[in-house]
Regions:
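Hot-dog-fold acyl-thioester-processing enzymes
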Residues: 1-84, 147-149
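HotDog/MaoC-like acyl-thioester-processing domains
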Residues: 2-10, 90, 94-99, 103-149
């Protein structure tokens, strides 16, 4: 279960238990729902002719999956608002069949100046594949309630 603002400390780290093996259906559904017509995500022939030689998983799916995996352990039940995502990088591609796992580390904490009983937590979220390659990373800031409020 997620924690409240006053229960976090800088340096707290979570290796999220939930993992996901990305399927063709995951990629196809997300790509079509978001109207992304990039052939590298949809066209096996075009993808085979690319430098990657196979279909690439949509990067925004990878990002969304990373955030989704972290919610139960970070913000579920204590979130007031997501404030933003910074320094999003995708240093390695994700392919169909990759198994992805996420981790989170608190890198900044500060009580809200305008909202008593609330505070801002910034996590570094990372996602790795089964080869332990970093495939996605970002900083996420969220406004959380304090348990003591």
């Amino acid at each position: 279960m997620a924690r409240f603002f006053d229960e976090w400390q800088i340096g707290d780290r979570i290796e999220h238990a939930l993992r996901r093996t990305v399927t063709e259906t995951d990629n196809l559904l997300f790509t079509t729902l978001t109207h992304n017509t990039q052939p590298l995500h949809l066209d096996a022939e075009a993808a085979r002719a690319s430098e990657f030689g196979q279909i690439l998983v949509n990067g925004t799916y990878t990002f969304s999956l990373m955030i989704g995996i972290t919610v139960a352990d970070t913000t579920a039940g204590s979130l007031v608002a997501n404030l933003g995502y910074d320094k999003l990088t995708m240093p390695k591609p994700v392919f169909l069949g990759d198994t992805l796992r996420a981790s989170s580390e608190v890198v900044e904490l500060r009580p809200s100046k305008s909202r008593p009983g609330q505070g801002i937590v910034t996590w570094r979220h990372q996602m790795h594949n089964q080869r332990d390659e970093l495939v996605c990373e970002c900083l996420r800031s969220a406004l959380l309630r304090s348990r003591s409020a």
